[in-house]
Amino acid sequence: MDDDIYGNLLAMKYILMPIWALLVVTTIGAAQSNPFRQPTASELAAAVRVIRADARCPARPRFVAMSLAEPSKTLWLDSAKRKSIPREVRSTIIDPPAAKVYEFTVDVVNKIVTEVRAVPPVQWMLTESDYARADSIMRASPRFVDALLRRGVSIDSVAIETWASGVPDASVRLVRCLLYHVDARGLNRYDRPIEGVSALIDLASGTIIQWMESPIRQTPPASSLHDLTAAINDGAFSSATRPPTLVDGEVQWNAWRFTPMLAAREGLVIYNTRWVDGVTQRPIAHRMALSEMLVPYGDTSVTWTWRNAFDIGEYGFGMTSSSLRKGVDVPTSAVLLSASFVSEQGVVRSVPNAIAIFERDGGVAWRHTTNAQAIASQRRRELVVQHIATLANYDYLVSYIFSNDGTITVDIGLTGVMLVKAAADTAFDAREFGEQMLAHRITRSLLAPTHQHYFNLRLDLDIDGVDNVVTEVDVRSPLDQSENRFGNAMMMDQWDIRSEREGLRTADPRMSRTWRVSSTRPNHVGAATAFTVIPESTVYPLLALSHPLRRRARFIEYQCAITKYNADEMYAAGAYPNQSAGDEGLPKFVANDDRLVRRDVVLWCTIGTTHVGRSEDWPVMPVSNARLRLLPTGFHSQNPLIVPQQSAPIKSKKTK
């Protein structure tokens, strides 16, 4: 494989640079050559026109999640064929009258449809028209009107929130609706639920097929949530750092090279990550992105027991992007990139400042004191690539953090507003009986049900090439006295994961379990160069084994699953998780039990958190985090921040 991807780079010294550590590179020609760069608004508009003009396109198409079509990895790895990679986008196309689903792929340079796939009966992610139709069906229902009258609530003061139904039946399009009071501006702030009312709606027939209602509860009073906008710009900050270099969509900072892109479904995607070692570009990851997400709620009342969300596959992370603001969300020195998406009606919409790239101080990178007068240390510098998706009440801050010590951290921040329910009474129960066993009281009138967040990351790692080996590493104290004569032994157990079914792995914090992805390239001591995958925020399923949601989201069973690379295997819960019957995604990916040793492997890592609400989480949650680290392990010959031949010896002052 040709290591020099974009032509002749200048020789560089990336160690012991000034803190901003910018890299100056040769420019590429006028023609854009990076196949991973963000699709432009004009490219998306061209794709819409080409699809509409195609004879196979429905008369009244709906466009869902149009994004960059995955460039062929086979072509990309062959340097002689890279220039032949077509510039393509792909979109799910819905034919509403026939309830048929297609996937169209368009070459936006040659303006032709290159592929059309007819998809077996599935339910696609929710769209704008689904929300509008559900709202109109609810408001026209006598049950809806009667429920509000009995509660003394005006119809005009109610917001209707639509959820994916969670019903495992793809033959009919179903959604569920919940009710909230709106504020004076007509906004749903989530602090005043109309508790105990929900509906299951058949969108095709326009009917409510299930009405759920529990005894009337008093609507909670308005909270300080309404005053948050007054402080929206508080805490503005700046940074003395400088932005990274971008060439044809590629970020170049210190020894790092990669291309960020915002997909309509997955949100932030990081392509073609390499580390520049002298004049050699060493591959680390071909593609890194969130694959799927699940949020199940733990309250057992009739309007809560069904609540769960596959936020990526049912709603889309990219399409729910929030614009980032300098000096508030990100430093003033950040580079901001916009992204464009296509609406259900085929209208191109741009989200300004959807991706932020900024450098920041990462604390002490290393330090050593030889004696009181001889102290050496260095600061860590980090480059952060960040995107924020806002899905109804929650805001998710997705960050990829590249450190100058060679570490990559994936950090998902959770903030926004908790989903709350109106309490049956205002008394605190210290025994936590009744509904306070399942939800934490945060005000006298509000309870926050316990829930979990699972984030599955699809990591297509290529450590120094595509032929990799994944090794599970445990650290334990040997029980055999012959191996632990003095009782202080700490032994590493290492075994290579040989096949896909064997590659369905769970974390074990008692063993400090990690997974090492090794190349076939020996390092300076003869061991294979590698990166270690460390899920720092593990979460374990609390759903009963018999719960149907576990079948629909098998990825939550494993903190790490390993599969052989397959370009068609992108989503841990399957391509269409909305109303899926289950066992899609990972169960099918591992069914062939392909061999994994010295193969092109993909890791599916699940991290997350169990959220037990606190009063401090109200009215808006401080950011909590779920993290995964990729740690170089024998990838470098030593600490990459230190170059001995360039370092002067530490001088100590003689003490008298």
Residue ranges of each PLM-predicted region?
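Bacterial N-terminal signal peptides that target proteins for export
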Residues: 9-19
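Bacterial N-terminal signal peptides
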Residues: 17-27
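Extended effector regions of multi-domain proteins
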Residues: 32, 113, 117-127, 183-407, ...
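Short, non-transmembrane alpha-helical segments in secretory-pathway proteins
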Residues: 36-77, 126-167
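Exposed beta-strand-loop-beta-strand "reactive/processing" segments of non-cytosolic proteins
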Residues: 58-109, 155-203, 385
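Hydrophobic or amphipathic alpha-helical targeting/insertion segments
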Residues: 102-132, 136, 140
